């Protein structure tokens, strides 16, 4: 993907998103959509995601984060565009 089409989002997901496999599901979703970046749990029980892809793919990714996990209950999802770092994969950080 070239630099003109690559976008990056910093996402904070709040709700019942820890202890339900959300990070592993997010990584699987990202790999299926060819999204690059990372996901990690935060101390306040939210989940932080950095995601890089084209605009349409990021839209699909964010929609799925909000609506498609079978056990999570997303109460809020906040995202902001950030500078792309050029991730080469999608990983879970601890």
Curated annotation (Swiss-Prot):
Query: What are the residue boundaries of the Acylphosphatase-like domain, all occurrences included?
Result: 8-94
One GO molecular function term of this record is:
acylphosphatase activity
| Domain of life where this protein originates | Bacteria
Entry's InterPro entries? Acylphosphatase, Acylphosphatase-like_dom, Acylphosphatase-like_dom_sf, Acylphosphatase_CS
Q: What is its EC number?
A: 3.6.1.7
Instruction: Give the signal peptide, or none.
Output: none
The enzyme class is hydrolase
Reactions that this protein is recorded to catalyse: an acyl phosphate + H2O = a carboxylate + phosphate + H(+)
Q: Which UniProt keywords apply?
A: Hydrolase
Gene3D superfamilies listed in its UniProt record: 3.30.70.100
* Residues at the catalytic site: 23, 41
Q: Which family does it belong to?
A: Belongs to the acylphosphatase family.
The name this protein carries in UniProt is Acylphosphatase
Gene name of the encoded protein: acyP
């Amino acid at each position: 993907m070239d630099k003109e089409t690559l976008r990056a989002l910093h996402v904070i997901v709040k709700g019942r998103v820890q202890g339900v496999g959300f990070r592993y599901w997010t990584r699987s979703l990202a790999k299926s959509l060819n999204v690059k970046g990372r996901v990690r749990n935060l101390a306040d029980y939210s989940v932080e995601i950095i995601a890089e892809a084209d605009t349409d793919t990021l839209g699909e990714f964010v929609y799925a984060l909000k609506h498609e996990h079978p056990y999570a209950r997303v109460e809020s999802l906040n995202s902001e565009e950030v500078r792309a770092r050029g991730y080469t994969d999608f990983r879970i950080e601890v």
